[in-house]
Amino acid sequence: MKAVILAGGLGTRLSEETVVKPKPMVAIGGMPILWHIMKSYTHYGINEFVICCGYRGYVIKEYFANYFLHMSDVTFDMQKNEMEVHTRHAEPWKVTVVDTGDETMTGGRLKRVGEYVSNDDMFCLTYGDGVSDVNIGKLIEFHRGEGKLATLTATQPPGRFGALNLDGCSVKSFQEKPQGDGAWINGGFFVL
């Protein structure tokens, strides 16, 4: 099974970071968001990825082109023009990076990568800017059991701000980010 990762948006809400790189390449704990997402899928045995690039997609291509070098200990002998690799660290990943256009919407990106997932009976899909603790194994199991065309995760987000409980002009208590309004939103993980 493959996972398609949407990584082509402009990243306007993280503009201070995304001036030079796409949002999935913003680091968390020293590694790009994209790496964390892929590690989550690997935990559930999914190691084939199709990445839909757009805005500054070359940064993602360069990351994977140089991944082995950056994740290994090496000695460069400049005089002999040689490189000796001491330790190798490689993920079990097969990664296809596809330029799907800077302004392309989600459906267009999926259409553009169709040839890379057309031989699969189903595939996972997620956004390249969200890290979560979704149980992807259970999501796939649910999808198979229901026999539907698509399965998506839904979540009820907490409120955005802490709340004050007032008694007239006096603060009675503080409540840290109470439950939201009860609405369900797209959790960003799909099986198609």
Show which residues each predicted segment covers.
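N-terminal glycine-rich phosphate-binding loop and ensuing alpha1 helix
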Residues: 1-66
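Active-site metal-binding loops of divalent metal-dependent hydrolases
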Residues: 10, 102, 128-130
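Short beta-strand-to-loop acidic/aromatic patch adjacent to the donor-nucleotide binding site
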Residues: 120-131
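Active-site nucleotide-sugar/metal-binding loop of Leloir-type enzymes
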Residues: 110-122
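Conserved core of the sugar-phosphate nucleotidyltransferase
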Residues: 64, 132-192
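Short mixed-charge
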Residues: 64-93
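A short, glycine-/small-residue-rich helix N-cap motif at loop->alpha-helix starts
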Residues: 101-108
